[in-house]
Amino acid sequence: LIDNYVDESVLLMLSKRQPGVTATIYTQRITSQLRLDLDRHKDQYPPVDVWTCKFSHDRFLIVDETDVYHIGASLKDLGKKMFAFSKLDIPATVITDLFFTTFAQSKVE
C-alpha cells in the first residue's frame, strides 16, 4: 500500500488478511500517533512492514505483486466519502521499480 495518510484504521484493515499474506506500507512520515499504533498492532497481529517515502502524491494498492490499483483517497477515509478504486493495466513492477531503484526510502523499525 502506498498511502501518505495511514492511521490505525488502515492497520486494522490489514489485520484481516489471511495467514501467510504479507503487507507493506509506504507512507510519507511516521507521526508519534502512528508509531504508537504500529507498536500496538505488532503486539496483536502479524507484522506489517512500513517504509517512509516522500515521493508519491497518489495512493496505490498492489495485490499479489501483480495487480495495481490507483486509489482516489486515503484508505483511512474509506466509507466516509465517495472515491474511486481504478485497476491500472500496467505491471506492478512499473510502480515497485520506482520505489526500489529510483526513490530513496527508509524502513521503519
Model-based region annotation:
Residues I2-E109:
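PLD/PLD-like phosphodiesterase catalytic module centered on the HKD motif
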